[in-house]
């Protein structure tokens, strides 16, 4: 299956958007399913950094470890799940628009299912994420444009 992709324009510079979205402690602020985030590596975030993310889908909470595998500030990043039955793969790209005063953010999310995850990914996870992602991007836009990320 192909990645779920969403794009949104944000009235903030690429540097501001990148700084906020790549700080994993902000995930519960703008992602509906993110319940808790715990850094497993020292700051600052870098290639190889690991983060534990707990998400709620329906009545169930699951925790997975995500690892940064690419980081190109302020343009792009790539994180990949390394454990759990459902392993997310998230790629983000930020393009400057309006002479760099605004940004176009594109997020692409895909999943690998392991064990029971092979059933959960197509039946539960992908439909949930397809619905949640556009709402999450609107929440992110609202937070950043309100200036909360500064």
Regions found by a protein language model. Give the residues of each.
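Residue-level preference for beta-strand/loop junctions
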Residues: 2, 47-49, 60, 86, ...
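Short, surface-exposed coil-to-beta transition loops
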Residues: 3-5, 61-65, 87-91
């Amino acid at each position: 299956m192909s990645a779920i992709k969403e794009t949104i324009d944000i009235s903030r510079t690429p540097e501001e958007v990148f700084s906020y979205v790549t700080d994993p402690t902000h995930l519960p602020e703008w992602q509906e399913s993110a319940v808790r985030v715990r850094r497993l590596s020292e700051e600052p975030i870098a290639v190889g950094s690991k983060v534990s993310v707990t998400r709620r889908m329906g009545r169930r909470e699951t925790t997975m470890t995500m690892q940064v595998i690419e980081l190109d500030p302020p343009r792009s990043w790539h994180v990949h799940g390394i454990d759990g039955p459902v392993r997310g793969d998230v790629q983000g790209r930020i393009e400057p628009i309006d002479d760099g005063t605004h940004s176009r953010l594109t997020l692409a999310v895909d999943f690998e299912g392991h064990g029971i995850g092979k059933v959960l990914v197509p039946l539960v996870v992908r439909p949930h994420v397809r619905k949640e992602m556009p709402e999450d991007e609107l929440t992110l836009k609202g937070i950043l444009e309100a200036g909360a990320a500064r």
